[in-house]
Amino acid sequence: MGGENSAKEDPVPKITVLQNNQQTSQNSQQNVSNVIKQEKPNDDKRQLSKEEEIELDKQYNNLKKSKKIPIVYCSYINNDKTHWKIVFLGTSGTAYEGGYFQVELIFSDVFPKNGPEAKFITKMFHPNIAKNGHVCMDLLNKWNEKTTIENVFYGIIDILDNPVPENGYSNEAKKSLEEDYQKYQDIVEEYTAKYAMEGF
């Protein structure tokens, strides 16, 4: 798996891959276990109110049970319920096909009034994703208390497949997409092969 983790983690000997994804074979489950890390306990994690913990637990469990999002792994980072790591499969028939993409979600103390910060751990080439992995997406900027984390991943997958350069960053990916779409697609495929299939 490409990119750099924001938390220091040790190899995990065993991983439970979500069973609702029929594309995930036994071999790919083993491959995921080779690159997903086990987080260390974090004594500095924020103390949650009972209401915050209930809401985060609900969102987390609903995401793990989703049958529409191609998620193969979902876990807390450093055993912190406000810091999640999610791995999902790229959409078939796109430049992301075959890739395993890591995203982290960071929930501040104003959640659920404001949405989480979403960042790709996997290195990406995309006009709506900054060099540091930060995702620029309307849904995250126009959050309301009825929005779900499942909605967030619908949005993330949709924006990968359908970039919105006018709402993105002034970066190389935006320039490439606007000037030569095929060249842009070729670069995305290269990134997928180099950073999202590492170890597979």
Question: How would you label these PLM feature ranges?
Answer:
Residues M1-Y100, I106-F200:
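UBC/E2-like fold recognition across ubiquitin and ubiquitin-like conjugation systems
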